[in-house]
Amino acid sequence: MSSGGLLLLLGLLTLWEVLTPVSSKDRPKKPGLCPPRPQKPCVKECKNDWSCPGQQKCCNYGCIDECRDPIFVN
């Protein structure tokens, strides 16, 4: 790959990283709470609720970010 192509790719990746959080910042969080922390190694499966399918939420458990079905508490 030429240096110009590599520079373009790097620029596009940087732009994508900067714009991704902004696009979901104005959206409200999905309803419900995250279930208890799973016992598994660190994984980064999602960045926010809107990167998860359906009603699932992006739940943060320290070094684990994963899509989980929400729990609802009355």
From Swiss-Prot:
Organism: Oxyuranus microlepidotus
Disulfide bonds: 34-59, 42-63, 46-58, 52-67
PANTHER family listed in its UniProt record: ELAFIN, WHEY ACDIC PROTEIN WAP
Purpose: Damages membranes of susceptible bacteria. Has antibacterial activity against the Gram-positive bacteria B.megaterium and S.warneri. After 45 minutes of treatment with this protein, B.megaterium have no visible pili and are smooth. Has no antibacterial activity against the Gram-positive bacteria B.thuringiensis, S.aureus, S.clavuligerus and B. anthracis, or the Gram-negative bacteria E.coli and A.tumefaciens. Has no hemolytic activity. Does not inhibit the proteinases elastase and cathepsin G. Is not toxic to mice.
Official protein name in the record: Omwaprin-b
GO annotation, biological process: antibacterial humoral response; innate immune response; venom-mediated disruption of cell wall in another organism
Tissue localization of expression: Expressed by the venom gland.
Keywords: Antibiotic, Antimicrobial, Disulfide bond, Secreted, Signal
PROSITE patterns xref list: WAP
Record keyword Disulfide bond present: yes
Family classification: Belongs to the venom waprin family.
Ranges of residues in domain WAP: 27-71
Cleaved signal peptide residues: 1-24
Molecular function GO terms recorded: serine-type endopeptidase inhibitor activity
Main location: secreted
Pfam family name, one: WAP
Protein location: Secreted
GO cellular component: extracellular region; extracellular space
